């Protein structure tokens, strides 16, 4: 399968092309010098041709299968965004609201960060993490195309460890279910007992003789 077309002019580097694909707005530009540093590639499996394509300054995406290039760039991206320079780049995107806001009403449009549910490629797509309610949500469809491993499971927490001044306060308000203004009892919100669940069998202490008596021989 050939690479999807960019929303921008196709002439340019592979990274320009990748970042220009609609739905890739969460991703960050990894500098060429970071990719060229072999230390940053330690432990990643790839061939030299894949790396050359990622670093190609004049990439032509016609009839080109980009699966391996996307994976390599994605795994490098996950490492870069937890580096000091990468965190600063992501901070700018966070403060601009590039990642969207929490869908929870009482978080009052708190800005969110991208997060992965796995650190392994091709397990799940990217999700969004709200630092206010400390929950994870599915992003809008056009923002959920990237692999979650591009961000990893640790990124939001590393981000706020480095930038503690950006940690928001937890939400004060909480939704309270009501009917005609009256608050519901907790039991009213619990699911009914399953009809299929077997009844609890209670053995009568009267119907059975104690074990010591049953073992007495008859005379």
From Swiss-Prot:
It holds the Pfam family CK_II_beta. GO terms for molecular function: protein kinase regulator activity. Residues 204-219 have a biased composition (Polar residues). PROSITE patterns: CK2_BETA. Residues 194-219 are annotated as: Disordered. One of its GO terms (cellular component) is cytoplasm. Belongs to the casein kinase 2 subunit beta family. PANTHER family: CASEIN KINASE II SUBUNIT BETA (PTHR11740:SF0). This is Suppressor-of-stellate-like protein. It comes from Drosophila melanogaster (Fruit fly). The lineage of its organism: Eukaryota, Metazoa, Ecdysozoa, Arthropoda, Hexapoda.
